[in-house]
Amino acid sequence: MLFRSDDCGFGYKRQGNVELLERMSKEYDFKLIVIPKLELEGEIVSSTRVRRLLSEGRIEEANRLMEDPFMICGPVVHGNHMGAEVLQMPTANQIPAEDKLLPPKGVYVSRIRYKDEIHYGISNVGVKPTIEGKNPVGVETHLLDFAGDLYGKVVTVEFLTRIREERKFSSIEALKEEMQNNIAYARAWFEKNES
């Protein structure tokens, strides 16, 4: 059984189409099911549309088009320990594969899944410009009301909405103040949307 959209193209220069698949299904004895395009909010739902919305930071719009929220999954790695030691806000750091589609650099409201547990938090996608040093693009997540150890554990971070762009602050104190504002925003967002 083969499922394809009604506008599929495949093969050399995308010359293959539904008509070719229909002929091939008779010749090679398989069932072809053609799925019509789905429209939502006046546009066709497609992976191209989802990628465009994600690359523009329009997380909530992209999530409405998918069965599950946009997420990354991977092990928690050691960072420079600035979150716990300097900011008093421990973070779970992940370094996604270079070819992984990520939303634009910035801070996001996030939901974190680990085993059967669900936690809420804020996630920064980017290079942590306020912290000196050359940092790879990563995802750094502060879990609200969580005191466990996730190093080496595989966690899933779901991006729910964008709070702001990543930016360099004039001081660690200014960064800490902004992180508290981000946490307050996230708590209000969860209270409104998750209750």
Could you describe each region identified by the protein language model?
Residues 38-39, 43-92:
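Anionic-ligand-binding alpha/beta catalytic cores of soluble enzymes and soluble regulatory domains
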Residues 1-2:
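Short, small-residue-biased leader/transition segments that mark boundaries at the very start
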Residues 7-12, 39-41:
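Short histidine/acidic/glycine/proline-rich micro-motifs that form metal-
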